[in-house]
């Protein structure tokens, strides 16, 4: 029964990925690569009710609103706007506010997902990271983005000082794992999650150092 269950789950996952690809193709929607340039340039306003300090879901919702043309960001925003999941979203949302971590799996692992986490700076700013991946599409390079959130202006500005090149051989074609526990970023080779990852240690500021 376990074998049948796993096969059924795999079929469902692959079907979901095929639907996602078909939706993007049919609608002429952009891939990660299409809106990559804008991600590194666009300032994002973060709106919260009243004077409440911005948190994990506020950063995630602001990002999805800034880039509404992607199937993945649309799906995540719909889920965030429906916290009790009354629409029975079949995808998996992991919310861990105490650790400043969010992950939204569009389909079963490995597949398509968005991760977001943030680090609190001594200045009160937040370093916000967003990672988007599509492990089934070899043409997709994936995205790893960093933003500097200023609580005074309530905006996230792209933080260009951190570049792909700062992460060893870069992130293209590899799997980025943002930290749910701890502070450090791990990068794996695609298709080999059992291999030892490259670890990049947060310097308690706005940079990551290879270990």
Language-model features: locations:
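Beta-propeller blade termini
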Residues: 115-122, 173-175
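Bacterial N-terminal signal peptides
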Residues: 9-19
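Terminal domain-start segments
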Residues: 26-119
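Positively charged n-region of N-terminal signal peptides that target proteins for export
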Residues: 1-5
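Short aromatic loop motif centered on NTY/YTY
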Residues: 155-211
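Mid-length scaffold segments of soluble, non-membrane domains
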Residues: 122-159
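Short, surface-exposed coil-to-beta transition loops
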Residues: 111-114, 128-131, 139-144, 170-172, ...
């Amino acid at each position: 029964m376990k074998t049948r269950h796993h096969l059924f789950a795999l079929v469902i996952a692959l079907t979901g990925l095929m639907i996602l690809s078909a939706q993007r193709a049919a609608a002429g929607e952009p891939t990660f690569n299409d809106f990559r340039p804008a991600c590194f340039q666009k300032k994002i306003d973060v709106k919260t009710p009243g004077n409440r300090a911005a948190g994990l879901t506020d950063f995630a919702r602001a990002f999805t609103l800034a880039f509404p043309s992607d199937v993945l960001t649309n799906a995540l925003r719909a889920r965030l706007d429906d916290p009790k999941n009354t629409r029975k979203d079949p995808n998996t949302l992991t919310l861990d506010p105490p650790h400043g971590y969010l992950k939204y799996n569009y389909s079963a692992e490995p597949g398509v997902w968005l991760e977001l986490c943030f680090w609190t700076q001594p200045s009160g700013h937040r370093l916000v990271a967003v990672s988007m991946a599509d492990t089934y599409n070899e043409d997709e390079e994936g995205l790893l983005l960093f933003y500097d959130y200023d609580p005074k202006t309530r905006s996230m500005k792209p933080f260009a000082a951190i570049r792909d090149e700062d992460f060893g051989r870069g992130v293209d074609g590899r799997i980025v794992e943002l930290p749910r526990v701890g502070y450090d970023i791990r990068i794996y080779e695609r298709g080999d999650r059992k291999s030892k990852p490259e670890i990049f240690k947060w310097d308690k500021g706005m940079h990551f150092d290879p270990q």
